[in-house]
């Protein structure tokens, strides 16, 4: 798949295309031709073809497509779902509608919609947001009952093209015909469940229209993942493959430190040193022999204190990545510890969980960093980092991560069912999310994997995206022919070597 565009980027391209001799009217004609071709390929002379038409330019695409279908001898009918078209282009298309095309109003034809052989959604375009209005819900309920082929024009109505949010009654397409580039929201949950197969069709927009558009969003797929895997020379030794120093764990949160360590070691890092509370050392060292341990000073509740910073920074001199936060806890002392490590560490830092929470009160310390910093927030942590609500983040998760990355010069791995790896103007979209990972410990594994890839030499953006791809794909593998309900973090860790073998040997 090529580049993905935001709604704003696509709108810019449509208007910029005029500089290269393609008008908005011509773009509508080109889109309609592509839509009509897909409709015709799924129809026969006897097919009952019903196009659901909105008032805007999405409806205009459908009206022009109806004319083209009529020219081919097919018998399309159009249903005006929101009244007559009201944009310049859609009104002009309506005025040119062939007299052989049957025109109906939605309120009288719900049974007609249900009985369509090919049902085409041209109601709402990329400007849709919020919920479907009550007065149009009967149309969408009729669409639900239709057993014919369902095709969406540009995106299914009811889907938000900016963030992937979707009304529960959104048009559920078998095929979505989208134009020039895929729109971001089509590839995000829950919208992806309404899109069916996504066909990206050329409508004559010159790629030079995109030259000034940032961020550049591309999917992170198996080809990119294999290319990003750190090279392992045959004569390599443990020092060749890097060392992670991890500041993690506390008396209250022992498991997080162990899960992140095991995930890192299962993904190829040569050495892993865990700097943690003595109680964590005593617990984990009895069964996890592969890493080394350093007991740190703690307060009376078993959380690490800031005076450990000097010791940890000394250890960083012989390491290639510093991981901070898994099970660390959040106190005034961890805030000081995290700030001092960020300000003084000269190796790349991966900051997760309570590392992020401890950073938030002193976030401007990121401006004093001496090395690369990767933040791995889930939506609530991203909201804290940005000083906004979770709702504001979820309405524009990419924008939130992008602005954070730009402001502080950091790499942001914005976790969710679909994950964005953001580094300045470059964004990877990772879509391997699964409910297998909707359990405690998943974030700890991800942080460990990302730190492992950084320690082995990956740049920050590749390490973040590859980490997300690795965890999601391994979780899918661990859950193969097993219930996602019953998979736990250790099952995923145990499956990592198999996933990496498959990736290394992928065609």
Protein language model annotation of sequence segments:
Residues 36-122, 131-153, 345, 403:
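Nucleotide and nucleotide-moiety/phosphate-recognizing core
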Residues 117-118, 123-215:
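Internal gly/pro-rich beta-alpha loop/helix module
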């Amino acid at each position: 798949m090529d580049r993905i565009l935001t709604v704003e980027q696509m709108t810019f391209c449509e208007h910029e295309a005029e500089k290269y001799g393609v008008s908005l009217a011509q773009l509508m004609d080109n889109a309609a031709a592509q839509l009509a071709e897909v409709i015709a390929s799924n129809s026969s002379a006897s097919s009952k073809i019903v196009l659901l038409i909105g008032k805007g330019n999405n409806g205009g695409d459908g009206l022009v497509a109806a004319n083209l279908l009529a020219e081919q001898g097919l018998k399309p009918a159009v249903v005006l779902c929101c009244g007559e078209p009201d944009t310049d282009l859609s009104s002009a298309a309506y005025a040119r509608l062939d007299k052989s095309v049957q025109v109906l109003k939605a309120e009288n034809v719900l049974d007609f919609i249900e009985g369509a052989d090919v049902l085409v959604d041209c109601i709402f375009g990329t400007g849709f947001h919020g919920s479907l209005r009550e007065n149009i819900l009967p149309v969408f309920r009729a669409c639900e009952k239709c057993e014919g082929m369902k095709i969406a024009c540009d995106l299914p109505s009811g889907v938000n093209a900016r963030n992937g949010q979707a009304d529960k009654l959104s048009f559920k397409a078998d095929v979505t015909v989208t134009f020039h580039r895929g729109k971001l929201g089509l590839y995000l949950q829950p919208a992806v469940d309404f899109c069916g197969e996504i066909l990206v069709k050329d409508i004559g927009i010159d790629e030079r229209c995109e030259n000034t558009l940032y961020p550049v969003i591309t999917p992170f797929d198996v080809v990119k993942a294999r290319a990003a895997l750190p090279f392992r020379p045959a004569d390599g030794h443990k020092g060749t493959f890097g060392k992670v120093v991890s500041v993690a764990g506390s008396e209250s949160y022992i498991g997080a430190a162990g899960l992140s360590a095991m995930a890192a070691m299962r993904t190829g890092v040569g050495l892993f040193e865990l700097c943690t509370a003595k109680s964590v050392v005593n617990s984990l060292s009895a069964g996890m022999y592969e890493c080394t341990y350093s007991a740190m000073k703690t307060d009376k509740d078993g959380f690490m204190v800031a005076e450990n910073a000097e010791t940890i920074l000394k250890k960083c001199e012989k390491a290639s990545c510093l991981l901070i936060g898994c099970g660390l806890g959040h106190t005034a002392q961890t805030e000081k510890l995290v700030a001092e490590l960020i300000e003084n560490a000269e190796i790349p830092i991966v900051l997760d969980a309570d590392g992020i929470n401890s950073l938030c009160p002193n976030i401007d310390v990121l401006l004093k960093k001496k090395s690369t910093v990767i933040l791995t927030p889930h939506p609530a942590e991203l909201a804290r980092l940005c000083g906004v609500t979770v709702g504001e983040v979820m309405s524009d998760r990419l924008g939130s991560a992008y602005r954070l990355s730009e402001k502080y010069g950091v790499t942001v791995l914005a976790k969710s069912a679909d994950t964005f790896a953001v580094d300045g103007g470059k964004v990877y979209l990772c879509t391997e999310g699964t409910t297998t990972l909707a359990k405690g410990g998943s974030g700890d594994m991800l942080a460990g994997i990302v730190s492992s890839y950084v320690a082995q030499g990956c740049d920050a953006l590749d390490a973040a995206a590859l980490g997300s791809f690795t965890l999601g794909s391994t979780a899918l593998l661990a859950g193969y022919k097993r219930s996602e309900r019953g998979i736990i973090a250790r099952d995923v860790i145990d499956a990592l070597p198999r996933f990496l073998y498959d990736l290394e040997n992928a065609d």
